[in-house]
Amino acid sequence: MTASERELAEQLNRRLRHVVLMLRRVSADQPITSQQLSVLGSLEHGPRRMTELADEHGVRLPTMTAQINRLERDGLVTRGRDAADARVVTAGLTEAGRDRLAAGREQRIGFLAERFADLTKEERDAVAAALPALDKLLGAP
């Protein structure tokens, strides 16, 4: 790693931290935490194994189980069993969970869209041009 790569990594780290904290503040009035909203997002395309969710979110299985317990209690997720292995517990979104995810996502996107309105066209174009490199850097799908 070169000194310039390290400096760029430090600058990006600071900005990512700021973005995460800013979006958490925007979502502070939501009835669920930003972490719970993130878990709902992980279930958007269908039920997932609890172990997969824990791995994706970088937490231990008991921590994810506690998150799913709260979301299930609130009617946002349901538990099921894996069709291939009935011993495996899965979690999936309910309609209420989909609605909550959509509302949380819309709140964040609306906030960011307002912020983009403060930028010049050239600044917005620069952000848009950086997105493919950020996807590659962060391993985004």
Model-found features: residue ranges?
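N-terminal leader segment of winged-helix/HTH proteins
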Residues: M1-S34, K136-L138
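Short, locally clustered residues in the helix-turn-helix/winged-helix DNA-binding domain
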Residues: G41-H45, R105, P132
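Alpha-helical structural segments
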Residues: Q11, H18, E44-H45, E56, ...
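Charged, amphipathic alpha-helical coiled-coil/dimerization segments
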Residues: N69-A129
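N-terminal helix-turn-helix DNA-binding core of bacterial DNA-binding proteins
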Residues: L23-T63, N69-R70, D74, T90
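Exposed, interaction-prone assembly regions rather than primary DNA-binding/catalytic cores
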Residues: D125-P141
